Amino acid sequence: MRDWNILEEVWQVIQERAEHPSAGSYVSSVLTHRKGIDKSLEKVGEEAVEFILAAKNQVPERTVSEAADLLFHLLVALQASGTDVGDVLDELAARRK
C-alpha cells in the first residue's frame, strides 16, 4: 500500500493557501476567483470528464494523471465549500462499519 499522507499534505497546503492567499499560487487563484465556488466546481467537472475519458479509453498513464487532478480539485472544492476533508473521511469510515 502506498503512503496516503500525501493527501493530508495536499490538504494542508490548500488550507494554508485559503487562509493566506499567495499571488503566485494556483490554489489561491482558484479559491479567490471572481466566480467564487463555481470556479472550483467547474474544475472538478472538467477533471472528472477527463478522468472518465482516460479510463474508458484505457490509457493508464493518462488515467493516473487525471485521477490525481480530480482528487486535487475535489480537495480544493471541499475547501471552497467550507467542508473539512476530515468529515468526508469520517463518513467513509462510518460506511465501513
From Swiss-Prot:
Belongs to the PRA-PH family. GO terms for cellular component: cytoplasm. It catalyses: 1-(5-phospho-beta-D-ribosyl)-ATP + H2O = 1-(5-phospho-beta-D-ribosyl)-5'-AMP + diphosphate + H(+). It holds the Pfam family PRA-PH. GO terms for biological process: L-histidine biosynthetic process. GO terms for molecular function: ATP binding; phosphoribosyl-ATP diphosphatase activity. It comes from the Archaea. It is an enzyme of class 3 (hydrolase). Pathway: Amino-acid biosynthesis; L-histidine biosynthesis; L-histidine from 5-phospho-alpha-D-ribose 1-diphosphate: step 2/9. The gene is hisE. This is Phosphoribosyl-ATP pyrophosphatase. Its EC number is 3.6.1.31. It comes from Methanoculleus marisnigri (strain ATCC 35101 / DSM 1498 / JR1). Keywords: Amino-acid biosynthesis, ATP-binding, Cytoplasm, Histidine biosynthesis, Hydrolase, Nucleotide-binding. SUPFAM superfamilies: all-alpha NTP pyrophosphatases. NCBIfam families: histidine_hisI. InterPro entries: HisE (IPR008179), PRib-ATP_PPHydrolase-like (IPR021130). It is found in: Cytoplasm. PANTHER family: HISTIDINE BIOSYNTHESIS BIFUNCTIONAL PROTEIN (PTHR42945), HISTIDINE BIOSYNTHESIS BIFUNCTIONAL PROTEIN HIS7 (PTHR42945:SF1).
